[in-house]
Design a protein with these regions (language model features):
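A conserved beta-strand element that flanks and buttresses the S-adenosyl-L-methionine
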Residues: 2
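A short His-aromatic
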Residues: 5-9
Length: 113
């Protein structure tokens, strides 16, 4: 399953992650990309922020409901996945990264065991 920048829009992301785990066959792979602020130890949510401009400032986009922290892989593991972060861009040259317009982000890969 490829879940590319979806979970930050979902109100109950824990339920969504559990559902992804449920529908994935044993040994299947989930790639779940989300915006991660590496300066945050834990994921941040604040439902009291309703102004679109303030949401953009805090969460990076007006329609996001959270900004993930370094605990994202733990959130996946709590739902039964075995996950790790892969830095694919580190395997490429700077020329390739620019050519393909890649970001140097960690790609969360989770396996259903």
């Amino acid at each position: 399953i490829l879940c590319n920048h979806v979970l930050e829009h979902v109100k109950d992301h824990i339920q969504a992650i559990s559902e992804l785990h449920r529908v994935l066959k044993k040994g299947g792979t989930l790639i779940a990309q989300v915006p991660i602020d590496e300066k945050l130890e834990t994921t941040f949510e604040d439902n009291s922020i309703i102004d679109p401009n303030e949401r953009s400032r805090v969460f990076g986009q007006y329609d996001h409901v959270r900004i993930y922290g370094n605990d994202f892989l733990s959130l996946l593991n709590q739902s039964g996945f075995k996950s790790k972060g892969i830095q694919y861009a580190n395997k490429l040259s700077e020329v390739e990264i620019k050519k393909y317009c890649l970001q140097k982000e960690v790609i969360p890969v989770a396996i259903k065991s």
